[in-house]
Amino acid sequence: MAVPRNRHSNARKNIRRSHHAKKACSAAVCSNCKQAFIPHTVCASCGFYKGKAVITVEK
C-alpha cells in the first residue's frame, strides 16, 4: 500500500481542495411558457421539451 513520504501542510491540502466546490447550475428559459427550468430536462410548468409536448401537467 502506498504511504506518503512527508506530511502535507494544511495550506497544501486547502489549495488542492480549492476546485472541489459545487458549481451552481444554470437556468434556461422555456420557449413555450417562458418559465425558468434546468437545461436538458422537461419544463416542469408546461411539460414541453425542445418544442414538443412530452408530459401532461395538471394545473
From Swiss-Prot:
SUPFAM superfamilies xrefs: Zn-binding ribosomal proteins (SSF57829)
UniProt protein name: Large ribosomal subunit protein bL32
Keyword Acyltransferase listed: no
Organism: Chlamydia trachomatis serovar D (strain ATCC VR-885 / DSM 19411 / UW-3/Cx)
InterPro entries (UniProt xref): Ribosomal_bL32, Ribosomal_bL32_bact, Ribosomal_zn-bd
HAMAP family in UniProt: Ribosomal_bL32
NCBIfam families: rpmF_bact
Keyword tags: Ribonucleoprotein, Ribosomal protein
One Pfam family cited in the UniProt record for this chain: Ribosomal_L32p
Location of region: Disordered: 1-20
Keyword Hydrolase: no
Sequence similarity: Belongs to the bacterial ribosomal protein bL32 family.
An individual GO BP term: translation
MF GO annotations: structural constituent of ribosome
GO terms under cellular component: cytosolic large ribosomal subunit
